[in-house]
Design a protein with these regions (language model features):
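Beta-lactam-recognizing serine transpeptidase/beta-lactamase-like catalytic domain environment
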Residues: 1-4, 10-236, 243, 289-290
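Short, gly/Ser/Thr-rich active-site loops of penicillin-recognizing serine hydrolases
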Residues: 152-155, 168, 245-290
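Short beta-strands and strand-coil junctions in structured, solvent-facing domains, enriched
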Residues: 237-239, 260
C-alpha cells in the first residue's frame, strides 16, 4: 500500500536532520496551494504560517512540499531506507514483501514532492509499524518477531534520540484537539500519531476517485511508548473515509484496551472530551490530504 500522510513525520525528520530546519522554523503555506511543475498541491484551507509541528498537525501538503523541495533527494531517501522502507523485515511471515523505495535518481520535483507525503512509495503495515517503532524506541531499529522473545531483540541506532523525541512531541499535537488525529485520543494516556487518507490505485492506472484507504499510525504513551499500532481500513463503507474519522477511533479503542491489558499505568490524564469532526473539504490533489 502507499502509506500516504503517515510518512510525513519522516519527511520532517529528514528536514531536522539536514540542519536546514529547526522545530521553530516557519513555512508560509499561503495561499493554501503550490504549483510544482505540472502539478498543483492544495490544502483544505489557507493555514498561513506554520512551524514544523503545525505542518504535521494540519497535515499540510503545501508545507510538506516546501520542506521536501529544500532537501537533497538522496538524503531524504537514505533516511527512509534507515527507517526500514524498501527492504524485507525478515519476520518469516508468509507473503511478506519488501515494498518499494524508488531511486532518487529518477525523481523530478513532482516526484520529490509526492514522495514526501507518501505517494510513489509502498510499504506493508508491518513496515510502517517498524518505522514508528524507531520513533518510539529513541532512534533504535530492532529486529521484528511474531512471537514473544526471551531475550531483547538486537537493535542498532539509526536516528538521533533527540530528534525522535521532537517528532513524538509533534505527533502528540497532531493527535490532539488541534490536529487531524483528535479521535485517536485515549483517556488517561498520551497519544502521538498521524492520519492518512488516500485514493486507491485504479486498475486502469492513476487513482480511483471513489475508492479510499484510511490509515492511522501511532504510539502510546508518548514519553515512554509501550505500543505502536497501525490501523488500515481498506475501502471504508459509504460515508466517512478520512483517516481521522475512520481509522483514528479504531486506534483509540484497540490501543487503549491493549495498554490496560498490559497494565500500563496512565502517565497522566489525557485531555477530556472530543473536538468536532475534521473538515470534509478536499484538495484538488487526487491523493488526499490527511
Amino acid at each position: 500500500m502507499e502509506p500516504g500522510s503517515t510518512v510525513k513525520p519522516f519527511t520532517l525528520l529528514a528536514a531536522l536532520e539536514s540542519g536546514k530546519f529547526k522545530p521553530e522554523s516557519v513555512i508560509n503555506t499561503s495561499p493554501g496551494r503550490i504549483k510544482v511543475s505540472y502539478k498543483t498541491f492544495v490544502d483544505p484551507h489557507d493555514y498561513g504560517r506554520l512551524d514544523l509541528a503545525g505542518i504535521l498537525t494540519k497535515s499540510s501538503q503545501v508545507g510538506t512540499t516546501k520542506l521536501a523541495l529544500q532537501l537533497n533527494p538522496d538524503t531524504t531517501r537514505e533516511l527512509f531506507e534507515r527507517m526500514g522502507f524498501g527492504e524485507s523485515i525478515g519476520s518469516g511471515f508468509p507473503g511478506e514483501t519488501s515494498g518499494s523505495l524508488p531511486s532518487y535518481r529518477k525523481w523530478d520535483p513532482v516526484t520529490q514532492s509526492t514522495f514526501s507525503f507518501g505517494y510513489g512509495i509502498s510499504a506493508s503495515a508491518l513496515q510502517l509499524a517498524r518505522a514508528y517503532s524507531i520513533l518510539a524506541s529513541n532512534g533504535f531499529r530492532k529486529e521484528v518477531s511474531m512471537v514473544a522473545l526471551d531475550d531483547a531483540p538486537e537493535s542498532v541506532a539509526v536516528i538521533d534520540p533527540k530528534l525522535t523525541g521532537l517528532i513524538r512531541t509533534m505527533l502528540e499535537t497532531a493527535a490532539s484537539d488541534q490536529g487531524t488525529g483528535k479521535r485517536a485520543m485515549i483517556d488517561g494516556y498520551s497519544v502521538g500519531g498521524k492520519t492518512g487518507t488516500l485514493h486507491k490505485v485504479a486498475a486502469t492506472g492513476g487513482y480511483d476517485q471513489h475508492r479510499y484507504m484510511s490509515i492511522f499510525a501511532g504510539l502510546s504513551p508518548v514519553d515512554q511508548p509501550r505500543i505502536v499500532t497501525i490501523v488500515v481500513i481498506d475501502e471504508p463503507g459509504i460515508g466517512d473515509y478520512f483517516g481521522g474519522l475512520v481509522a483514528a477511533p479504531v486506534f483509540s479503542e484497540v490501543t487503549g484496551s491493549a495498554l490496560r491489558l498490559l497494565q500500563v499505568p496512565p502517565p497522566r490524564l489525557a485531555t477530556k472530551g472530543r473536538a468536532n469532526p475534521i473538515s470534509r473539504s478536499r484538495s484538488s490533489w487526487s491523493g488526499g490530504t490527511c
